Protein backbone atom coordinates (compact mmCIF):
# COMPACT_ATOMS: atom_id res chain seq x y z
CA UNK A 1 0.00 0.00 0.00
CA UNK A 2 1.27 3.47 -0.79
CA UNK A 3 -0.49 5.36 1.98
CA UNK A 4 0.92 6.67 5.21
CA UNK A 5 -0.93 3.97 7.17
CA UNK A 6 -1.10 5.82 10.48
CA UNK A 7 2.58 6.64 10.64
CA UNK A 8 3.47 9.03 13.47
CA UNK A 9 4.58 11.61 10.90
CA UNK A 10 0.99 12.22 9.83
CA UNK A 11 -0.47 15.44 11.28
CA UNK A 12 -3.71 13.50 11.80
CA UNK A 13 -2.03 11.46 14.54
CA UNK A 14 -1.32 14.59 16.57
CA UNK A 15 -4.23 16.97 15.84
CA UNK A 16 -4.53 20.34 17.56
CA UNK A 17 -5.48 19.55 21.16
CA UNK A 18 -7.93 22.44 21.48
CA UNK A 19 -10.27 20.77 18.96
CA UNK A 20 -10.40 17.38 20.70
CA UNK A 21 -13.53 18.13 22.75
CA UNK A 22 -15.51 19.69 19.91
CA UNK A 23 -18.61 17.92 18.58
CA UNK A 24 -17.91 15.50 15.71
CA UNK A 25 -14.14 16.07 15.87
CA UNK A 26 -13.38 12.41 16.58
CA UNK A 27 -15.59 11.42 13.64
CA UNK A 28 -13.92 14.03 11.43
CA UNK A 29 -10.51 12.55 12.26
CA UNK A 30 -11.83 9.12 11.25
CA UNK A 31 -13.03 10.55 7.92
CA UNK A 32 -9.70 12.18 7.13
CA UNK A 33 -7.66 9.17 8.26
CA UNK A 34 -9.85 6.85 6.19
CA UNK A 35 -9.17 8.90 3.07
CA UNK A 36 -5.45 9.06 3.87
CA UNK A 37 -5.31 5.29 4.37
CA UNK A 38 -7.64 4.47 1.44
CA UNK A 39 -9.86 2.66 3.97
CA UNK A 40 -13.12 2.44 2.05
CA UNK A 41 -14.97 0.27 4.58
CA UNK A 42 -14.39 2.58 7.55
CA UNK A 43 -15.22 5.63 5.47
CA UNK A 44 -18.39 4.04 4.08
CA UNK A 45 -19.53 3.04 7.57
CA UNK A 46 -19.35 6.63 8.81
CA UNK A 47 -21.00 8.26 5.79
CA UNK A 48 -24.67 8.17 4.84
CA UNK A 49 -24.45 11.21 2.57
CA UNK A 50 -28.19 11.39 2.01
CA UNK A 51 -27.84 14.35 -0.31
CA UNK A 52 -24.59 13.40 -2.02
CA UNK A 53 -21.28 15.18 -1.62
CA UNK A 54 -19.09 17.71 -3.34
CA UNK A 55 -15.50 16.50 -3.08
CA UNK A 56 -12.13 17.52 -4.48
CA UNK A 57 -10.37 15.38 -7.10
CA UNK A 58 -6.57 14.87 -7.28
CA UNK A 59 -6.25 17.88 -9.60
CA UNK A 60 -8.07 20.12 -7.09
CA UNK A 61 -11.32 20.35 -9.04
CA UNK A 62 -14.82 20.10 -7.58
CA UNK A 63 -16.43 16.70 -8.02
CA UNK A 64 -20.20 16.64 -7.33
CA UNK A 65 -21.68 13.25 -6.48
CA UNK A 66 -25.45 12.96 -6.13
CA UNK A 67 -26.19 9.50 -4.69
CA UNK A 68 -24.73 6.58 -2.74
CA UNK A 69 -23.87 4.54 -5.83
CA UNK A 70 -21.97 7.51 -7.21
CA UNK A 71 -20.30 8.02 -3.82
CA UNK A 72 -19.08 4.42 -3.72
CA UNK A 73 -17.88 4.55 -7.34
CA UNK A 74 -16.06 7.85 -6.67
CA UNK A 75 -14.10 6.55 -3.69
CA UNK A 76 -13.26 3.22 -5.31
CA UNK A 77 -12.02 5.13 -8.38
CA UNK A 78 -10.14 7.71 -6.30
CA UNK A 79 -8.37 5.15 -4.12
CA UNK A 80 -7.46 3.01 -7.15
CA UNK A 81 -6.15 6.06 -9.03
CA UNK A 82 -4.03 7.20 -6.10
CA UNK A 83 -2.64 3.68 -5.62
CA UNK A 84 -1.84 3.35 -9.34
CA UNK A 85 -0.04 6.70 -9.24
CA UNK A 86 1.90 5.68 -6.13
CA UNK A 87 0.53 8.83 -4.52
CA UNK A 88 0.03 9.51 -0.83
CA UNK A 89 -2.44 11.94 0.67
CA UNK A 90 -2.62 13.50 4.10
CA UNK A 91 -4.37 16.35 5.86
CA UNK A 92 -3.45 19.02 8.38
CA UNK A 93 -6.35 20.48 10.33
CA UNK A 94 -6.08 24.26 10.36
CA UNK A 95 -9.37 25.21 12.04
CA UNK A 96 -12.53 23.47 13.18
CA UNK A 97 -15.91 24.63 14.48
CA UNK A 98 -19.05 22.65 15.19
CA UNK A 99 -22.60 23.01 16.47
CA UNK A 100 -24.95 20.26 17.59
CA UNK A 101 -28.70 20.62 18.22
CA UNK A 102 -30.63 17.46 18.99
CA UNK A 103 -30.32 14.95 16.19
CA UNK A 104 -28.51 17.23 13.75
CA UNK A 105 -25.31 19.18 13.72
CA UNK A 106 -22.77 20.69 11.40
CA UNK A 107 -19.10 21.36 11.37
CA UNK A 108 -16.81 23.57 9.36
CA UNK A 109 -13.36 22.12 8.75
CA UNK A 110 -10.46 24.12 7.37
CA UNK A 111 -7.66 21.82 6.35
CA UNK A 112 -4.69 21.52 4.05
CA UNK A 113 -4.79 18.39 1.94
CA UNK A 114 -1.49 17.21 0.51
CA UNK A 115 -0.89 14.95 -2.45
CA UNK A 116 2.62 13.50 -2.57
CA UNK A 117 4.01 11.77 -5.62
CA UNK A 118 7.69 10.95 -5.24
CA UNK A 119 9.51 14.12 -4.28
CA UNK A 120 6.67 16.39 -5.42
CA UNK A 121 4.02 17.66 -3.02
CA UNK A 122 0.85 19.50 -3.99
CA UNK A 123 -1.15 21.27 -1.30
CA UNK A 124 -4.77 22.30 -1.33
CA UNK A 125 -6.12 24.75 1.24
CA UNK A 126 -9.64 23.44 1.67
CA UNK A 127 -12.81 24.18 3.60
CA UNK A 128 -15.46 21.51 4.14
CA UNK A 129 -18.91 21.93 5.58
CA UNK A 130 -20.18 18.69 7.05
CA UNK A 131 -23.78 17.98 8.06
CA UNK A 132 -24.09 15.32 10.76
CA UNK A 133 -27.13 13.29 11.80
CA UNK A 134 -27.66 11.12 14.83
CA UNK A 135 -28.49 7.50 14.02
CA UNK A 136 -29.03 4.48 16.29
CA UNK A 137 -25.36 3.65 15.59
CA UNK A 138 -24.07 7.14 16.45
CA UNK A 139 -23.29 10.24 14.42
CA UNK A 140 -22.99 9.86 10.65
CA UNK A 141 -22.00 12.27 7.93
CA UNK A 142 -25.13 13.21 6.00
CA UNK A 143 -23.52 15.75 3.65
CA UNK A 144 -19.95 16.81 2.80
CA UNK A 145 -19.19 19.85 0.70
CA UNK A 146 -15.53 20.71 0.15
CA UNK A 147 -14.11 23.67 -1.71
CA UNK A 148 -10.49 24.42 -2.52
CA UNK A 149 -9.59 27.94 -1.40
CA UNK A 150 -6.08 27.91 -2.85
CA UNK A 151 -3.60 25.39 -4.18
CA UNK A 152 0.09 24.97 -4.80
CA UNK A 153 0.65 22.27 -7.41
CA UNK A 154 4.12 21.65 -8.88
CA UNK A 155 4.07 21.42 -12.68
CA UNK A 156 5.12 17.75 -12.53
CA UNK A 157 2.08 16.89 -10.42
CA UNK A 158 -0.25 19.03 -12.49
CA UNK A 159 0.71 16.94 -15.52
CA UNK A 160 0.28 13.66 -13.63
CA UNK A 161 -3.20 14.52 -12.30
CA UNK A 162 -4.73 16.07 -15.40
Stretches with model-predicted labels:
Residues 1-50, 157-162:
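Short, low-complexity N-terminal intrinsically disordered segments enriched in polar/charged residues
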Residues 62, 114-117, 149-153:
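A short local loop/turn or secondary-structure capping micro-motif enriched for an aromatic residue
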Residues 101-136, 156-162:
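Exposed beta-sheet edge and beta->alpha loop/turn motif
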Residues 3-6, 92-101, 146-147, 161:
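Glycine-rich beta-strand-turn "strand-cap" elements at beta-sheet edges
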Amino acid sequence: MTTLDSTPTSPLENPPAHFLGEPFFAETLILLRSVRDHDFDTLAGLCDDDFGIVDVDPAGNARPIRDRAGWEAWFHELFATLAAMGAETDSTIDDYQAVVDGGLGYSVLYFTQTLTLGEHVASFETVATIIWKRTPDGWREARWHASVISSDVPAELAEATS
